[in-house]
Amino acid sequence: MYEHLITPEGMSRRHFMRHLATTALAVPAAQFMTALTANAKELKKNNKSCIVLWMGGGPSHMDTWDLKPESDHGGEFKPIATAAPGVMISEHLPKVAKQFKNLSIIRSLNSKEGNHDRGTYFMHTGYQPNPTVVHAGFGSICSYELGEKLENFDLPHCIAINTAGQSAGFLGMTHTPFVVQDPNAPIANLLPPKDVNEMRMERRMRMLGLVENRFVKEKRGIASGDHKAVYDKTFRMMNSQYTPALKLDSVAAAERDRYGRGSFGSGCLMARRLVEQGVTFVEVALGGWDNHADIFNTLKRGNLPQLDKAMGALVEDLTSSGLIENTLIVWMGDFGRTPKVNQNSGRDHWPNSWSIVIGGGGIKGGRVVGATDKDGVDIVDRPVSVPEVMATMAKAMGIDPSTQYTTPRGRPIKIADEGAKPIKELFS
């Protein structure tokens, strides 16, 4: 029997916004136009945020964070020093290297998931795919555990940029990621239609309110209440003073250039602006890591320069503003790539050993957890599991990893599977 889900694989931003553009809620419009009282800096003193930099396709540890220059398959790239003594990374990441006082590397992550979809699911939820249940993504967990505690906050608690993000699963549609498909483009339907004046909007609000209230009273399932809550949140967002964080047209040209004008650079800049306003979770995706051929030219001409500029600027800005103390940053992908270079000058799927980078939010910087052998093949020190990473992220966000949820069908599910514990080396 399949687990009863409140929501399927997610709700598109188009559906989320389009219907609100021609309808509204049964509450006085003035209430939604009232400015928020919370100051962003005060908000951030007591609340944590997480930014996940998602590298879809499976990035190579051998060419980023765990170089093996002595190996026959070490590749073309050379290691360079970072701000952390003894920690070396790729020569094509010099800006990120300067930020390693606040970043650490896990070099011994491993799993059995070498398929893109399964690996993506595993890394986002901490659980291997199971046909009987859709687990909640970490962003939705952060929204549920932390975002709901923010009163009068009109932006979404979970936002995905350049990606659809991971489903909220059994947590319901109110915690499904709000999707920004292109951070360089205006978000469609963020404002009411020009031909809908205030009086017309109020009439629609009353009508929708009657329909929604009757729908909920008829007890048509938990999803009916979620549906109303989503519309409520959306309308408040349309009139929020914090909505400009989702727009980059007013950002100075020099600042745009520091991050890069591409979708990933702009996404990282938007992520910083969102956490400055108190958004709990933002994921920014950079695809193109499935390098089965010509990996060295592809990386040095494309993804690595983009990553270096955007990630370097992001960590630098969070550090200078002090937000790094309350903002967890995680760089990760679905799995790694083979240490051995194939006949097409590429690397293939490799879940046996790979690296992720983590920092901020109370994580100690300049650390290296785990190690692979001289060829980057086998883990020779401190193997780390995906559930351990999930537990570590939860702890950094102030969430108890052992927290247990009960799905609508009564199934107990913990945040971290297999009794996984946080990686203590990153906290002491």
Model-found features: residue ranges?
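Ligand-binding pockets and gating/stacking loops
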Residues: 1-428
